[in-house]
Swiss-Prot record:
pH dependence: Optimum pH is 6.5-7.0.
Keyword terms, alphabetized: Host cytoplasm, Host-virus interaction, Hydrolase, Inhibition of host innate immune response by virus, Inhibition of host interferon signaling pathway by virus, Inhibition of host STAT1 by virus, Interferon antiviral system evasion, Late protein, Protein phosphatase, Viral immunoevasion, Virion
Name the record gives this protein: Dual specificity protein phosphatase OPG106
SMART domains: DSPc (SM00195), PTPc_motif (SM00404)
Regulation: Inhibited by NSC-62914, NSC-28086, NSC-105687, NSC-23173, 540211 and 217691 with IC50 values of 48, 51, 212, 342, 4 and 11 uM, respectively.
Database matches in CDD domains: DSP (cd14498)
Chain ranges of the Tyrosine-protein phosphatase domain: 23-171
Compartments it resides in: Virion; Host cytoplasm
Gene Ontology terms, MF aspect: protein serine/threonine phosphatase activity; protein tyrosine phosphatase activity
Active site, UniProt feature: 110
Subunit and interaction comment: Homodimer.
EC main group: hydrolase
Enzyme Commission code: 3.1.3.-, 3.1.3.48
Gene (name only): OPG106
């Protein structure tokens, strides 16, 4: 087995058959200005203690937040095993990086705050990694976020796409 196949096997195996996690209900602060949440968190964003500048909506449904100065960015993504989310990684991670640098709080969400938004958050954190071992960093981030939130990037296709871009292609 070559190195890339071994890494992919180990990463998918170590994150695949875990006990079923409970869906998260609370918003999670990921970095100083990047937050991960669900649809309900987005609907409550205008009244949140955090003064969000942006909401990144990754659901299929477009919406507005009445009486709010929050800018909504909509990327309609389907949560299934055929959706290619990797084509959005570079743009989303660059956007989240700018929000962090400019101190502009952003809430990234999908319906449950697990797969689509979790994948983009994981991609963002992986893109910031300057460590020499992306495989270990992936496992650290994945399991840390799962411990914090419960369910986190349960879609095997989304995990595979992140592993291919940020772990396999880095080695």
């Amino acid at each position: 087995m070559d190195k890339k196949s071994l890494y992919k096997y180990l990463l998918l195996r170590s994150t695949g058959d875990m006990r079923r996690a409970k869906s998260p209900t609370i918003m999670t602060r990921v970095t100083n200005n990047v937050y991960l949440g669900n649809y309900k968190n987005a609907m409550n964003a205008p009244s949140s203690e955090v003064k969000f500048k942006y909401v990144l909506n990754l659901t299929m449904d477009k919406y507005t937040l009445p009486n709010s100065n929050i800018n909504i960015i909509h990327i309609p993504l389907v949560d299934d095993t055929t959706t290619d989310i990797s084509k959005y990684f570079d743009d989303v991670t660059a956007f989240l990086s700018k929000c962090d640098q400019r101190n502009e709080p952003v809430l990234v969400h999908c319906v449950a705050g697990v797969n689509r938004s979790g994948a983009m958050i994981l991609a963002y954190l992986m893109s910031k990694n300057k460590e020499s071992s992306p495989m270990l960093y992936f496992l650290y981030v994945y399991h840390s976020m799962r411990d914090l939130r419960g369910a986190f990037v349960e879609n095997p296709s989304f995990k595979r796409q992140i592993i291919e871009k940020y772990v396999i292609d880095k080695n």
